[in-house]
Every structure is written in C-alpha cells, then in structure tokens.
Regions:
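Conserved small/polar residues in nucleotide/adenosyl-binding loops
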Residues: 383-393
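Glycine/threonine-rich ATP-lid/beta-loop region of ATP-binding domains
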Residues: 111-113, 138-147, 151, 155-278, ...
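Short, charged, low-complexity patches
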Residues: 87, 309-317, 344, 348
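GHKL (Bergerat-fold) ATPase N-terminal catalytic module, capturing the glycine-rich phosphate-binding loop
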Residues: 1-177, 185, 192, 205
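Switch/coupling subdomain of P-loop NTPase systems
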Residues: 287-326
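Short beta-strand elements
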Residues: 280-286
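Glycine-rich phosphate/pyrophosphate-binding loops
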Residues: 327-335
Length: 393
C-alpha cells in the first residue's frame, strides 16, 4: 500500500470546493455520472479503433444506496484505470483525463469532462471517498481512499471486472442523499438523457400471456433493471428519422404537465462554425404567458446544465420551449453558469434566424393556418426577428 499527498496548489482544496466551487451540492451526482459516462464512451472509442482488445458489450452505469453503511455507490463498466493512472488523474486536482483524451483522439465524440474537478465534488456530501478500479489493460486493480484531507492511500484491489466503483461515505449533514426519492429526483433532473443506460434499482414487468393461455391464466411478473434515462433523445437524431408524433412525444417527455400541443417545432443541427443540436417548440400560449416554468433546457453532450439560457436565447424568444445541446457554449468551472463569448453570440444569432425562417415558411405555405395561430405567436415580433436574422456568423 502506498500513501501520499494529493497534488494541489493550496494546503486543502476540499473546503474550497465545498464552499465556493459549486453553488449547489446536489450536482455532485451529475459530475460523477458524467465521469462514468466518459469512461464508458472512451472504451467504446478505443474498441472501435482497435486499441482496446476487449468486448465492449452493453455497458451500463449503476447507482446504489446502502443505508446501513451510509454509502452511495456509482459503478461503471468503462475503461477503468491502472494504479499509475489513478496517481495521474485522481491525485492531481484539475488535471482532466477527459481533456487529455480528447486531445489524443480528436474524433472521440461525446466526452464530457473539461476541468478535472468533477470527481472532487464528491467531498461536498461525503466525509470519505473510495475508488476501486480495474483497467481494460491487463494490470492489477487499484483501491484509492481519501478522507477529505490532502492525504490518500492507494493499494491493490481484488476487483476482477473492468470499470470503476466510487463509494461515497455520506456525511451527517448530507443524509438526504441516502434517500431513494432524492437520488431518483436528481437522476431525472440531470441524467435523464445521458448516452449510457443508468440503472437505479429494479422494477416489476408483466409478461404478455401467450395466445393459447387459459382464461384464468395470470401473467408472469419478472424483475428487470430500472433504467431511468432515454439514451437516444429526439434531438440526437436526424429530422428525417422523426415523425410529427415523435416530436410531440418528446415535447410530452420534456413537459409532462403541458396538455396543449405546441404550434410548431424547429430542429437545430449545426456542426460548423459551431456545434449545436436541439429542438425548440413554440408553445400554445393562450392568455397566460408564464415564462418561469417549462423553460428551454441547456445540455452539453446530453448532460443537463441549466435552464437559465439568457444570452444564448434572445429575450424575445424566451417563451420558446425545448432543448439546446452544445459543447461550444463556455461554462464556468462548475458547469453552472454561462460565460458569454463570440460563440454564444453566433449561436444566439443562428437560433433567431432559424425561428425567423420557420415563421416565414409558415406564412408562405399556409397563411390561413398562420393567421389562426397569430394570437399565440404575435408575442414574437416578426420585425424584431428579421432585424436579428441579419446578424452574420
């Protein structure tokens, strides 16, 4: 077993992380699951290019609660780490393995991590963290432990299956994160569209009866994994793959309490000069414009970031609903706040142009239908849209 000090630029970074880095402690789960997703996508990429001589299979991420031990477990079946990689990526705060991986493999789409601090968000809710990991390479597993001080222990582990398990020993002031309802709520808030299946417990599923079943036959119930996320949401698909019913179903998935159908949708899909995907809906407003609920949601590589999209979406389009997903929108280190730059202005101008184009096509194709919808869409000034449409990017 080896011991050492975590390489940080201050004597103890953990109180700073807990107090200043993240505005909301609950996002630790988003960060840890994002890391697990990264590890799995890295393995997929390496197997695709022949660098990893292992079977990718159908990996998933599992989240488990152990109330008796007061622990929360996040388990992936991804790339794993060797002891040397744990030293490099875990013990050097702010050195991001995902960022280095992207630089080495420019075509590795979907890698989320940027700052290398996400793992340490665990210490916002845990007074001890364990990491047990086995690399896809033929090397021994490693077991890293830290109690929130700069000191850590690193020893061999008897783990035989590929991947990483993170064990959070939940602190007394964070016991709510040992409640199933709370973890379920957070998973659905931040991770419901992540690209890797996420298992949280099990559920009962009823099998259909065979055609020749007796009249008094009872259907069989089986226990299956409770997968909480949709790994292929509508905005990740090509418009040619989707029907109007698919778009409506996605709207209902985003806003289950909205009973009115949207008036129209706009599918965003750009890869130059910036990356932007998403689907925006123009809701039926009626006489009640409530801009505080059911807002546009911002994602980065299918990870929810915020629904505060001021700056990306112009003020006069904030009544739209839907999803925007872009890795090119700069965020602060905690991924909580937008940082305005040239890319954001270009994306904002593009969104405005797409809305203007859609409204123009509605007038051209079916003016009568457009006039019927006027009471709902007049809140967006057509003149205002056209003025913004002239912005160049």
């Amino acid at each position: 077993m080896s011991k050492g000090n975590i390489n940080v630029s201050v004597e103890n970074i953990f109180p700073l992380i807990k107090k200043f880095l993240y505005s909301d402690h609950e996002i630790f789960l988003r960060e840890l699951i994002s890391n697990a997703s990264d590890a799995t996508l890295k393995l997929k990429h390496l197997t695709n290019i022949g660098e990893a001589k292992v079977e990718y299979g159908n990996p998933k991420i599992e989240v488990k609660i152990n109330k008796e031990d007061k622990t929360l477990h996040i388990i992936d079946q991804g790339i794993g780490m060797t002891a040397d990689e744990v030293e490099k990526y875990i013990n050097q705060v702010a050195f991001s393995g995902a960022e280095e991986f992207i630089n080495q493999h420019k075509d590795a789409d979907g890698i989320i991590g940027h700052f290398g601090l996400g793992f340490y968000s665990a210490f916002m809710v845990a007074d001890k963290v364990e990491l047990i990991t086995k690399s896809y390479k033929d090397e021994p597993a490693a077991h890293w432990t830290c109690d929130g001080s700069p000191e850590f222990t690193l020893e061999k582990a008897d783990k035989t299956d590929r991947g990483t398990e993170i064990i959070l020993h939940i602190a007394e002031d964070s016991k709510e994160f040992l409640e199933e309802w709370k973890i379920n709520e957070l998973l659905h808030k931040y991770n419901k569209f992540m690209p890797i299946p996420i298992k949280f417990g099990t559920k009962k599923e009823t099998l259909p009866l065979p055609e020749d079943a007796a009249e008094d036959a009872k259907p069989e119930e089986i226990e299956v994994d409770n997968i909480i996320n949709n790994t292929q949401p509508a905005w990740t698909k090509s418009p040619s793959e989707l029907t109007d019913e698919d778009y409506l179903a996605f709207y209902r998935e985003l806003y289950p309490m909205q009973f009115e159908e949207p008036l129209f949708h706009i599918h965003l899909n750009v890869d130059y000069p910036f990356n932007l995907t998403g689907i925006l809906f123009f809701p039926k407003l009626g006489n009640n414009i409530n801009l505080d609920k059911d807002r546009i949601q911002l994602y980065q590589n299918q990870v929810f970031v915020t629904d505060e999209v001021n700056g990306i979406v112009p003020d006069f389009l904030m009544l739209l609903r839907g999803v925007i997903d872009s890795p090119d929108i700069p965020l602060n280190v905690s991924r909580s706040y937008l940082q305005a730059d040239g890319a954001v202005k270009k994306i904002s101008a593009h969104i405005t142009k797409k809305v203007a184009d859609k409204m123009s096509s509605l007038i051209t194709q079916n003016r009568e239908d457009y006039e019927k919808k006027w009471n709902d869409i007049k809140a967006v000034s057509y003149t205002h849209l056209r003025a913004h449409e002239t912005l160049r990017y």
